[in-house]
């Protein structure tokens, strides 16, 4: 932006920043106006120019910084390094409350062309600070205040988020949520087809409303299966989006089952892994059913429900609980194609569960990504365990029983988290 750069070099910092703001050059705005990323800086610019385009950036930045200060950072992250990494400023409660007071003043003093911006910012900060009623009042006021279409949309989304903290899940409220989610979906669809804008803003909005609002609301209302389904809905939408923009299906060697691996970085898998086999089966039955509630119907139709994936997960859960006969109906339907495209395929293909691990460690070439699996070892394991347990129940005391017990111990250890197989 040649004009903005010329303004900056001539000492007209605010004018230059306004020009960058108009053109949407966020990187340049941060460089030019970085010292104003605080309430004091916002007040200074507002006094100079109540309708400065730079204020749009600074207000948004301030609210984001309040959110980042309150949000949980990674456990192993140093505070200073983490905020530097995400380019955020720490905003504490006193300054945040002072901002709320200032934003409400600006939103009602008729000097700003866009009171919606200020009132919705006040609502979001109050929500983050736990001031529920004040946040709700400000959001309602913001929706009816003057602002750009994006500002008014943000105010509407903020109101939706605020309602999740204190509402009851009755028919009226779930109907409201369904309408708002469908509205967000329409906004997502529109922005995805507009190359001139960041194409994930409303997806980010929906993600926060789901994970910070709707998911915990269902959980605390005694509906854990719905809460998990809501979480999975967002995972699937995100995975579908990135699979499409990365053209994964057109890549050589692509296999859909490689997108269905179980790993600890997948928040939905982590939640499912904490369930018992019976609970996991109940969840699968729920997402493959047709709930009577319209909002729940909306959710389950958007969840991931591949039969191979869940057969593996449920069967393995039953196997882990020692319920081998119940595991077999699920494990026996697994295909070698699915098993060959799982992260543990190298172990299933090359390691044996009947080798005593206390004597032998089965090493593999860990550079392999996937390996061709030709035998369903989990199924074979379950059948062998049932046979050995049956033999043990009728074996005589002494060497025969000891031999069977040793074989059982070998297999139990190999099948555990300390073993080599899975």
Residue ranges of model-derived segments:
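Extracytoplasmic/secretory-pathway proteins
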Residues: 1-422
């Amino acid at each position: 932006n040649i004009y903005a750069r010329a303004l900056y070099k001539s000492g007209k910092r605010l004018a230059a920043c306004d020009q960058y703001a108009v053109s949407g050059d966020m990187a340049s705005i941060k460089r030019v106006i970085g010292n104003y990323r605080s309430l004091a800086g916002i007040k200074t610019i507002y006094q100079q120019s109540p309708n400065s385009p730079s204020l749009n950036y600074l207000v948004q930045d301030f609210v984001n910084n309040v959110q980042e200060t309150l949000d949980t950072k990674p456990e192993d992250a140093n505070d200073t390094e983490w905020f530097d990494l995400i380019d955020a400023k720490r905003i504490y409660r006193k300054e945040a409350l002072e901002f709320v007071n200032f934003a409400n003043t600006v939103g009602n003093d008729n000097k700003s062309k866009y009171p919606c911006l200020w009132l919705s910012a006040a609502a979001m900060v109050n929500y983050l600070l736990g001031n529920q009623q004040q946040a709700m009042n400000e959001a309602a006021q913001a929706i009816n205040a003057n602002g750009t279409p994006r500002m008014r949309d943000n105010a509407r989304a903020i109101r939706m988020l605020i309602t999740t903290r204190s509402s009851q899940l009755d028919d009226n409220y779930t109907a409201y949520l369904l309408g708002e989610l469908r509205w967000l979906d329409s906004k997502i669809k529109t922005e995805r087809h507009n190359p001139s804008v960041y194409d994930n803003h409303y997806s980010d909005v929906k993600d926060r409303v789901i994970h910070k609002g709707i998911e915990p609301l269902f959980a605390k209302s005694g509906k854990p299966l719905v809460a998990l389904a809501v979480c999975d809905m967002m995972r699937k939408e995100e995975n579908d989006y990135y699979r499409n923009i990365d053209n994964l299906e057109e890549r050589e060697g692509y296999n859909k089952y490689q997108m269905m691996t179980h790993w600890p970085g997948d928040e939905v898998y982590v939640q499912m892994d904490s369930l018992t086999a019976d609970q996991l089966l109940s969840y699968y039955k729920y997402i493959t059913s047709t709930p009577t509630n319209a909002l729940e119907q909306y959710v389950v139709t958007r969840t991931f429900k591949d039969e191979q994936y869940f057969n593996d997960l449920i069967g393995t859960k039953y196997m882990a609980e020692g319920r081998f006969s119940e595991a077999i109906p699920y494990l026996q339907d697994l295909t070698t194609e699915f098993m060959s495209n799982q992260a543990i395929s190298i172990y299933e293909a090359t390691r044996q569960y009947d080798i005593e691990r206390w004597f032998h460690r089965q090493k593999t070439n860990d550079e392999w990504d996937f390996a061709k699996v030709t035998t369903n070892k989990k199924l074979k394991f379950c059948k062998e365990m049932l046979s050995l347990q049956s033999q043990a129940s009728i074996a005589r005391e002494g060497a025969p029983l000891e031999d069977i017990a040793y074989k059982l111990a070998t297999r139990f250890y190999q099948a555990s988290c300390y073993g080599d197989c899975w």
